Amino acid sequence: MDAPIEVDTQRARFQNSTGRNIQYVDDVSWIKSKHTLQFGGNFRHIPTIHIRNDKVVGSLASLEALSDADVSTFLSAIPSSERPPTCSVTLTTGCLQSGDAQRWDRLYASTLGLVDNIGILTTRDGSLKALPFGTPLANDTTLNAVEFYGQDVFRITPNLTLTYGLSYGWQTAPKERLNRQTLVVDTSNNNQSLTGPGYIAAKEAAALQGKMYNPTLGFDPVKSAGRNVFNIDWGDVAPRASVAWTPTFDSGFLHRMTGNRKTVIRGGFGLVYDRINTVQSVIIPMLGVGFAQTISVGAPLCNASGTPGAGCNAAAGTGSPGAASFRVGVDGSLPLPTVPAVSIPVVPSTPFGELFSFQDDPNTKVGRSRAGDLTIQREIPGNMIVEIGWTGRWSDRLPQGVNFNSAPYFFVDQASKQSFAQAYDAVATALAAGQTPAAQPFFENQLAGLIGSACAGSSTATTATQFLANAAASNFTGGLVSSLFSVMDGRRTCLGLPTFQNRQLFDLHMRTYIGKSNYNGLIATLRKRTSHGLTFDATYTFSKTLDQNISNQNQAGIYSNSYFPNVDYGPSLFDRTHIFNLSYVYDLPLGKGHRFGGGSWTSRLLGGWYTSGIFSAFSGLPLFVTESSQVWGGGSIFGFAVGMIPTVNPSSFGNSVHGGVTGSNGIGTTGNPANKGTGLNLFADPAAVFGDFRNVQISKDGRTGRANPIRGLPYWNLDSSLGKKTALTERVSFRITADFFNIFNHVNFVDPTLSLTQKASFGVISTQLVPTNRDNTLADGSRWIQLGLRFEF
């Protein structure tokens, strides 16, 4: 088991989208003196019907029973008494490495069939009446997109042209035929709509003062709220301007450099707006609470169905989940969830009346990019043109998700002034070293009264710190901050104390507009126009793109740190420093009219041959040694894995394939040739490299390891073609071709995984990179030859 909820719904689910695009476009051009004026408009009416039987993850419109441990929604953490001891300096056999405690707990829960929750997706009609189990979720929406533009190409002189213009547009929010959309609201504040930045800022401010911020959330149907799921962004004004200059110098150095009207200098700047795609405009608004709801039975006890199996001890509670929890196949029929009655606004019950909700920020903005470029183009002898230039993009307001239930890891205990982060790091450091952690004031004060109470179950711990270290050791050693907050909230609920997190939902994903990225690139291009049968185009790019580890609009990802997204600021996952591409076509100088000609039949035999090819070479993508996605409390499911901190310069590791690597100390060992491994590894000594990274310390570190990545394997490939065209008559000819994909049979490998939780496969290379045009069951990434014969008439 590797997740606390059913993530494989994305394999079992079905989705159907039926969309149309009714579009009207009108453009006008008017030439007046030195001006070429252009005006136009674009109107789109976009009706869309989307039907699905899932809510991304967590449930289907059919019953599911889920098993997990440690990052569970409901199931108690596996206590240390039910796992082998943690290895230390003095204990090296019959023990678990600190990073393997979570894997053991999950094996324990899945082997015994311990049920975390039993759930199903239930849907409601436009009046919130529950529909029969198995009814899929459906939305029938319409929206409009409008754009206008104006532009002037002003040829000031024969050598100088100025282009400037302005565009303006907007996109409406989707209108659902039965109003089956909701907004998340604060029920204690007159059902005020909540925004992503506003909620996160309020929660942060409260935590720094040692206070809880958990307003009771409601989900208000748009008809009741009297508004759309998000506001129209009316401010998308997009100016742009560019200039092109052909210098004319009659003599001297500048004349020799620029030639006689053979050089063009171009520069420009523009503001460009994104569009809101179907996921954000149609799908997310239908995944809120109310018209779609995951109902569940959380952590049922072994006697829940009245037919407990052997060994059932429901009274053991959290002290022994193996004895107290419902066991699939042992304790009878699964207990069924009950569909709750709802009112307006829909208020999920506690604990976890709903597992997940997806919402659009009602104040969402359209992403934008400030784009600039400056290039110099020069014609040179040989029918060639060389161009060198810079291009840049600075983007903001990009769509990205925040989690309302991001754990406030900076929460300050007002009595001791110790933060959760400080207490957490102290315990995590001690456990990693195999030591007993000292009592931490934060845990003792925030869980006051726990020791000696029924809320501690059968634990023999004498301090709250020891209780947490025993019950949730892997939460400390594995960076599972969100899960640890869930454990603490469970105990605080039992003690009658307010919780750190909202307990109505496990996670609330809100798509908001605070993402940032930038790109800068130096581009050099050499183009040859066709002469002597040869034409080619060669381009080299030296660039860097940086972002906050954000994802595309159609992704469900959230920031690993919703409070401070810039902790992940670093090279984008697709960043390549060096990129070179070359394409060419060459008509061989054979046959009539060429250097090597001949008679009629000789010319027909020798003539018409040509070759072409595409060569590509890239430097490696950024790679990160990762721990969990919960390091900053971002959430259990949708967050991105956090990069560990390198203690040496990652460039010292290199980025080439090493052969004959067996691995050691349980690190990189799946590649051992003696165990039928590949023997290939990104590192000559994976264990040594693994030791050069440390866990993020949330009380001290302001950035993650994404700021300083390892670079993955470089790539190069040549595809080439050889062909001949032969004329039979004036109107009939035939062509034979031989296309060679990866003509040199060069192996390109997929970058390996580098995860704290998968030590055995650390750095192990086991997969070839298969081009998208291959049938990987037949050719993999090896040389592929395609022969062709074509008649033309």
Task: Describe the function of each predicted region.
Residues 1, 19, 44, 54-64, ...:
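Flexible, surface-exposed loop regions and adjacent strand-edge segments
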Residues 1-23, 30, 115-133, 300, ...:
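Acidic/polar loop-and-plug regions of large Gram-negative outer-membrane beta-barrel proteins
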Residues 19, 143-175, 179-180, 190-192, ...:
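Structural signature of Gram-negative outer-membrane beta-barrels, strongest in the C-terminal barrel
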Residues 25-27, 33, 40, 151-153, ...:
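Alpha-helical hinge/cap motifs
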Residues 76-110, 114, 120-124, 190-219, ...:
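Surface-exposed intrinsically disordered loops and tails
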Residues 133, 140-142, 159, 169-173, ...:
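Short, solvent-exposed micro-motifs at the edges of structured domains
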